[in-house]
Amino acid sequence: MEQINIEIAYAYPHNHYLKSFTLDAGTTVQSAILQSGILAQYTDIDLRKNKIGIFARPVKLTDVLKNGDRIEIYRPLLADPKEIRRKRAAQQAARQKGKI
């Protein structure tokens, strides 16, 4: 059977997991994740909650992998990006007001 080479990536702010695997052609995203053993190593990953992508493009667990794909397992956001921008803008406005 034909083989494909893929990578699986999972990142924290100060460290990351990136490993290469050789799998059978026709392997799905979910099957590759399960075969990799990453779920045992990082127990905070929940395939029902964590979003999955290939090169920053969202994918389904049932999608079939292609040679060279990099599966990325995304962590949930800890803060709302819009709220962070609002706070930063308010702080900057307060600093500007204080300089005048």
Curated annotation (Swiss-Prot):
Family named by the database record: Belongs to the UPF0125 (RnfH) family.
A Pfam family found in this protein is Ub-RnfH
PANTHER family documented for this protein: UPF0125 PROTEIN RATB
What's the domain of life for this entry? Answer: Bacteria
**Protein name (Swiss-Prot/TrEMBL):** Protein RnfH
Which cysteines link up through disulfide bonds? none
